[in-house]
């Protein structure tokens, strides 16, 4: 293994030390990080194997707001400055790439004018395997994004997205379907 890989693994191990002894955080093997990872809150955060949380500019923030909340990051996922906030559940599948986006399973306020001062209802967010989410994307509560999908920069996702498409815009809409042969990383493990 080249010395740079050894140094990156050592740095990843050292920078995740504050989380290695917390009961509510599970760090998968070979997690890469560079000190730009912040995990806070009383809920559970789980990383799969070979997750890369190596952000060059922005901090990766994983925040749980309730003890029963869960954030799961699948194997081989890459996080680059994303913010994930869970009151119930946010799942990111295997082989996903997340830019400086925001995923929330709840809003800090209710949509109803009558209940505006109360927190919104939590609805799970699920990102299936091999999804690429660009920068400045907002994924709102209750959304499921199908596998092998690309979400373009600055998109705001209100509704479920089918598998194998490229979406963009505000609100996000399907721009085109991806070729079935081009999708899927299909790493073996």
Predicted feature descriptions by range:
Residues 116-128:
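Glycine-rich NAD(P)-binding loop of Rossmann-like domains
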């Amino acid at each position: 293994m080249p010395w740079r890989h050894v140094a990156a693994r050592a740095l990843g191990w050292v920078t995740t030390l504050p989380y290695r002894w917390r009961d509510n955080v599970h760090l998968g093997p070979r997690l890469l990080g560079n000190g730009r990872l912040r995990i806070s809150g009383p809920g559970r955060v789980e990383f799969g194997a070979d997750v890369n949380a190596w952000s060059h500019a922005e901090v990766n923030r994983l925040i749980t707001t309730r003890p029963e909340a869960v954030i799961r990051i699948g194997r081989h996922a890459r996080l680059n400055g994303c913010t994930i906030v869970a009151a119930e559940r946010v799942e990111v599948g295997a082989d996903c790439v997340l830019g400086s986006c925001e995923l929330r399973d709840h809003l800090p306020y209710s949509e109803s004018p009558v209940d505006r001062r109360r927190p919104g209802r939590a609805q799970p967010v699920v990102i299936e395997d091999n999804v690429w989410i660009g920068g400045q994307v907002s994924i709102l509560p209750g959304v499921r994004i199908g596998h092998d999908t690309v979400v373009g920069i600055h998109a705001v996702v209100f509704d479920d997205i089918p598998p194998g498409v490229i979406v963009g815009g505000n609100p996000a809409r399907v721009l085109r379907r991806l070729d079935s042969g081009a999708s899927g990383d299909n790493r073996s493990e």
